[in-house]
């Protein structure tokens, strides 16, 4: 699909379709499946995306927004639950020394290879609209590696450590996003939830 042409066509359409991020709610239509099972299976994720696409007249389909996925690839500890998305426990990086030592993982580390495969499978199932890969944004990923609350303070106390982590996660996310595109994703949707947070 030529996404430039798609975007131009959108501008001229008199009525606009929604672009909801409905991946996890789709689980309620999948006969007793748990979130824990969903986030660990490329096949189930693709089926869930297809189910949402079948039930909604949306502009595009987007993969699961599992905001623990990329942090887990860096070595952070993910906690899994039956009825809610995974979460990162603790901080992997708290000092400049740990930021300097942080290694950029290969795509495929943790569950990232499974997520890339999920996009490839979803692209085969969903043929009537674009398929977007949901990827965490750099600052939100840095926050999961440094602790969501603590990064707000570290920005002031050790800004160089935050910059070092941001450089490394950005490098990784570019490679990861390209892997999603190579698997067939028509685009990449970045979720940077921490950008709107601040401390007083």
Language-model-detected regions and their locations in the chain:
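An N-terminal domain-start capping segment
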Residues: 31-49, 91-102, 138-143
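Short C-terminal domain-edge/linker segments immediately following a structured domain
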Residues: 48-54, 92-97, 161-166, 185, ...
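Active-site loop segments of alpha/beta catalytic cores
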Residues: 1-27, 35, 106-200
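N-terminal basic, low-complexity leaders that serve as flexible interaction/assembly modules and, when applicable
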Residues: 1-83
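A gly/proline- and charged-residue-enriched helix-loop-helix capping module
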Residues: 83-121
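Low-complexity, flexible helical/coil segments
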Residues: 54-59, 96-106, 166-173
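Glycine-rich loops and low-complexity Gly/Arg-rich segments
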Residues: 42-47, 85-90, 156-160
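Aromatic- and acidic-residue-enriched segments that line the glycan-binding/catalytic groove
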Residues: 38-39, 73-87, 140-154
């Amino acid at each position: 699909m030529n996404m430039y042409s798609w975007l131009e066509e959108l501008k001229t359409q008199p009525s606009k379709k929604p672009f909801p991020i409905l991946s996890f709610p789709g689980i309620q239509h999948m006969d007793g499946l748990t979130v824990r099972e969903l986030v660990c299976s490329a096949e189930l994720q693709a089926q869930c995306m297809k189910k949402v696409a079948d039930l909604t007249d949306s502009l595009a389909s987007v993969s699961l927004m599992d905001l623990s996925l990329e942090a887990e690839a860096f070595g952070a500890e993910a906690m899994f639950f039956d009825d809610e998305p995974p979460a990162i426990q603790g901080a992997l990086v708290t000092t400049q020394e740990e930021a300097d030592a942080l290694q950029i993982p290969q795509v495929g580390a943790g569950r990232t290879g499974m997520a890339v495969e999920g996009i490839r499978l979803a692209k085969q199932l969903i043929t009537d609209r674009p398929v977007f890969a949901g990827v965490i944004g750099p600052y939100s990923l840095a926050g999961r590696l440094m602790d969501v609350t603590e990064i707000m303070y570290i920005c002031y106390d050790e800004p160089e450590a935050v910059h070092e982590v941001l450089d490394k996660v950005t490098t990784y996310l570019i490679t990861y996003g390209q892997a999603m595109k190579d698997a067939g994703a028509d685009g990449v949707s970045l979720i940077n939830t921490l950008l709107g947070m601040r401390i007083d």
